[in-house]
């Protein structure tokens, strides 16, 4: 059997002959790692920045990406942005979150800095995302036990022993009253 081209929204397609009269077709779709809003539509993109789906219903567990102006959001075409460097960092953050099996509700780009929102915690990653920074999240989030605030990973390095966490003011007042 010959090979043809695969549609951009598919990761892999395999066709097998099961018997002389039947075939098995297996299709693996590209998984979205984030989405942006385009009016009332949710525009989902994969780890390469390719728009893999557009719809009016949100998919649970995929983070909203805010703060980047995108020129075009056409289905099966790459997202184009003037801020390609920071967009690359956002894609990297999405990939690393997926590897760590973490779900961020939102990824925000503000003044060339990246922020993740995981539950009640805002994680400040700075201008560059590294796998080491994201790898710190699971144990830290477990220790925070639902506290609200900002976790500062923008200056994190492997030889750093402490990572600053600013408790949200309302949470701090409640704990002082008790």
Regions found by a protein language model. Name each.
Residues 80-138:
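Soluble extracytoplasmic domains of inner/organellar membrane proteins
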Residues 17, 25-31, 66-69, 118-120, ...:
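Flexible glycine-/small-residue-rich
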Residues 3-31, 50:
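Membrane-embedded segments
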């Amino acid at each position: 059997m010959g090979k043809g081209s695969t549609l951009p929204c598919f990761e892999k397609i395999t066709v097998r002959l099961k018997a002389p009269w039947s075939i098995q077709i297996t299709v693996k779709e590209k998984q979205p790692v984030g989405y942006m809003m385009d009016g009332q539509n949710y525009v989902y993109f994969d780890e390469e920045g390719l728009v893999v789906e557009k719809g009016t219903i949100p998919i649970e567990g995929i983070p909203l990406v805010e703060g980047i102006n995108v020129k075009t959001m056409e289905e099966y075409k790459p997202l184009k942005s003037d801020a390609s460097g920071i967009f690359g960092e956002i894609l990297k953050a999405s990939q690393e979150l997926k590897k760590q099996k973490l779900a961020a509700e939102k990824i925000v780009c503000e003044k060339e800095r990246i922020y993740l929102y995981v539950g009640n915690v805002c994680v400040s990653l700075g201008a560059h995302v590294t796998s080491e920074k994201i790898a710190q999240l699971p144990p830290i989030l477990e220790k925070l036990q639902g506290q609200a605030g900002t976790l500062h990973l923008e200056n994190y390095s492997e030889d750093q022993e402490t990572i600053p966490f600013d408790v949200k003011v309302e949470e701090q007042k409640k704990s002082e009253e008790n």
